[in-house]
Amino acid sequence: GFLSSVGNGPGELNRWPYFSGTSVHGDTVYMYDNMSHKLNAYAVQIKDQNLTYSFLGNKPTRENGDGLPEGVINQMAFELVRLENGYSIGFRVFSNGTIFTLFDKDLNEVKKFGEYLVDEGLMDGEFHQSICFQGLRLSRGNSFFYAPHNFGYMARYDVSDEGELSKVWERWYSEPSVSVDNNNLKFEADNPQGFYGLAV
């Protein structure tokens, strides 16, 4: 079966969701629709090696994550980037000042990291737009490379076999030109673009 329908007409999702999560017990899957700001819930059951699921409903959810069901875990966007030692890094959709989450080999959260790429003076407690910092994320060995689309910035992090995270280097290639209006990050007309291609 299908978890959802996609399109501009009636359906559970208006576009492909970029948020997913599971309940602590793994019996419920959540998918977030960015266009409608609704969180769709599905009951999941595995029996005789078959996966079945049913739509439970949806509820409005604020962009900062308020309204998420208690116990939702594995909050991330797009694909996970997996390192050679089994650790993974996911881009955070709902966050408060950090961009990434480091997961262990069993996809349990280890820590959050990666500060927002704008001056802290521009932000307040209601600013949660981590999606503005999305970009290219690649791995090589146990190294993780990040180059955002909207900022002339690049960074490399290493993760040890014990899960210790270290920033090896970061570089700014251009000065961003941004402002915050009504808690929304605004890129000015003269803001230099970041990266849309990266190879390691």
Question: What is the predicted function of each stretch?
Answer:
Residues 41-52, 107, 157-168:
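Short loop/turn segments immediately following beta-strands, especially the blade-tip
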Residues 31-35, 90-94, 146-149:
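Conserved beta-strand positions in repeat-built beta-propeller and related beta-rich domains
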Residues 139-164:
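Beta-propeller domains
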Residues 1-15, 54-72, 110-129, 166-190:
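Surface-exposed loop and turn segments in beta-propeller and other repeat-based domains
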Residues 34-91:
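Asp-box/WD-like beta-propeller blade repeats and closely related beta-sheet repeat scaffolds
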Residues 37-43, 96-101, 151-157:
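Structural motif
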Residues 20-24, 74-85, 129-141, 191-200:
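Structural signature of eukaryotic scaffold interfaces centered on beta-propeller domains
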